[in-house]
Regions:
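N-terminal pre-P-loop "Q-motif" helix
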Residues: 1-3
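Pre-Walker A (Motif I) flank of P-loop NTPase domains
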Residues: 10-15, 94-96
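Conserved alpha-helical scaffold flanking the Walker A/P-loop in AAA+ ATPase domains
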Residues: 5, 59-65, 70-98, 130-131
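Walker A/P-loop
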Residues: 14-58, 120
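Walker B catalytic acidic pair
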Residues: 95, 101-102, 113
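Basic, amphipathic alpha-helical bundle interface domains used for macromolecular binding and assembly
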Residues: 85, 108-321
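Conserved inter-motif catalytic segment of the P-loop NTP-binding fold
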Residues: 42-74, 81-82, 233-239, 243-246, ...
Length: 321
């Protein structure tokens, strides 16, 4: 839940790793409900893309898209194509959520097609003599099992996979793609009582509304400071936006050296830490008596070591890092 809140507040991409039946898909489906309402400009742009893909429905106006293509989808289905070119799933998720379940089961060209839009928010389609560019600013949520049988690390069921099989399975996802993902969440096996009738849903609606208010307050804080969510900060602006304390800088420098992180990964950790700090700021702000939301007058403090420490834990276990 905490990582989902951070992802929503900062527009960060999210990788969920865990055995089957642990609720990875349910978590992904909750994300759109935590995101801020679409602005008129966002709704217009998303509707225009959907119209080009012949997938516009008036009843969905203003609702953030949630696209969940099957793992058998081709690179063309994800990216788009045709004559004339039409947007694929990547663009149809513009201003919304793209959920890729069973991530290693997608073919390699399809996965590699994600790299451009994750960096730029746009996708270029070149087919024969035609070339088209579509917006593709989506929030990626990906899910995978930890191994081919799905039970590596499952205390309730033994894993049948050899180390070599696990390495091959995880190796289907390239290092450059993994490096572009922000948050890793290991989703553990839950006891059956967790999913008993009424146990999950009793306070879930109220809890979601509370988290959504914090997310919106943190987004407003970031927007007022830099005109964009934290995940969309360019590398040159990341450190100044973080405004880190000396303790935060020292902690991240030590972690980066020990874990061999690249400059791209460092920037991602600073962005995550900035979001953690924003959530901490709005969490301590006095609530508006009318709405219950955090007031917009809360100051934006620096990123401290405690914020960096939380951000590090979402990166240190990424496959290949």
């Amino acid at each position: 839940k905490r990582a989902l809140e951070i992802a929503a507040a900062g527009a960060h991409s999210l990788l969920l790793v865990g055995p089957p039946g642990t609720g990875k898909s349910m978590l992904a489906q909750r994300l759109p409900g935590l995101l801020p309402p679409m602005t008129d400009d966002e709704a217009m742009e998303a509707a225009a893309v959907a119209s080009l893909g012949r997938d516009f429905h008036a009843g969905l106006w203003g609702l953030r898209p949630f696209r969940s293509p099957h793992h058998s989808a081709s690179a063309v289905a994800l990216v788009g194509g045709g004559n004339p070119p039409r947007p694929g799933e990547i663009s149809l998720a513009h201003e919304g959520v793209l959920f890729l379940d069973e991530l290693p089961e997608f073919n390699r060209p399809a996965l590699e097609s994600l790299r451009e839009p994750l960096e730029t928010g746009r996708i270029t389609i070149a087919r024969a003599a035609r070339r088209a560019e579509f917006p593709a600013r989506f929030q990626l949520v990906a899910a995978l099992n930890p191994c081919p049988c799905g039970h590596r690390g499952n205390p309730l069921q033994a894993c049948r996979c050899s180390p070599e099989a696990v390495a091959r399975y995880q190796g289907r996802i390239s290092g450059p793609l993994l490096e572009r993902l922000d948050l890793l969440v290991e989703v553990p096996v839950q006891p059956p009582s967790t999913f008993a009738r009424g146990h999950v849903s009793s306070d879930a609606e109220a809890d979601t509304a509370t988290v959504a208010r914090r997310v919106q307050a943190a987004r407003r804080l970031a927007w007022a400071a830099q005109g964009r969510p934290n995940a969309h900060l360019p590398p040159a602006a990341t450190l100044s936006a973080a405004d880190p304390t000396p303790a935060a800088q020292a902690l991240l420098a030590t972690a980066a050296e020990r874990l061999g992180w690249s400059a791209r990964t460092l920037h991602r950790v600073w962005r995550i830490a900035r979001t953690v700090a924003d959530l901490a700021a709005v969490g301590t702000a006095p609530a508006d008596p009318g709405t219950g939301a955090a007031c917009d007058t809360v100051p934006r403090g620096p990123v401290d070591a405690v914020h960096v420490a939380e951000a590090i834990q979402y990166r240190r276990s990424l496959i290949g890092e």
